[in-house]
């Protein structure tokens, strides 16, 4: 199978920085950090934000983040409301 025939394509991956307890990133929520990572991944891949069909978002401690952290991050990154989002614990 060639890439052109495969309907699933991973075009980019980015991770957030590793922070310390009460460090420089303490004012940001996981979805806010995720939005920055998603924006960077989309920019690096050179694709339009509305062409992203799915987001898989890892979140170790989702308590207190509200509903659907993956959805929050995707919308914060400017992706389409039609993008499917899954939060992985």
Identify the meaning behind each predicted range.
Residues 1-4, 43-45, 76-77:
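Terminal domain-initiation and capping elements
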Residues 1-31, 40:
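Condensing-enzyme catalytic core mediating Claisen C-C bond formation in acyl metabolism
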Residues 2, 45, 57-63:
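N-terminal glycine-rich phosphate/pyrophosphate-binding loops that anchor nucleotide-derived ligands
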Residues 31-46, 69-73:
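Short, well-ordered amphipathic alpha-helical segments that serve as non-catalytic structural scaffolds
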Residues 48-54, 82-84:
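Short acidic capping loops at alpha-helix termini that bridge into adjacent secondary structure
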């Amino acid at each position: 199978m060639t890439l052109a025939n495969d309907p699933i394509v991973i075009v980019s991956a980015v991770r957030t920085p590793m922070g310390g307890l009460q460090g420089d990133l303490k004012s940001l929520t996981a979805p806010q950090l995720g939005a920055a990572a998603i924006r960077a991944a989309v920019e690096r891949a050179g694709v339009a934000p509305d062409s992203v069909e799915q987001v898989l978002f890892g979140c170790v401690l989702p308590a207190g983040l509200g509903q659907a952290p993956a959805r929050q991050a995707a919308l914060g990154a400017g992706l389409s409301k039609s993008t499917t989002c899954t939060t992985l614990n």
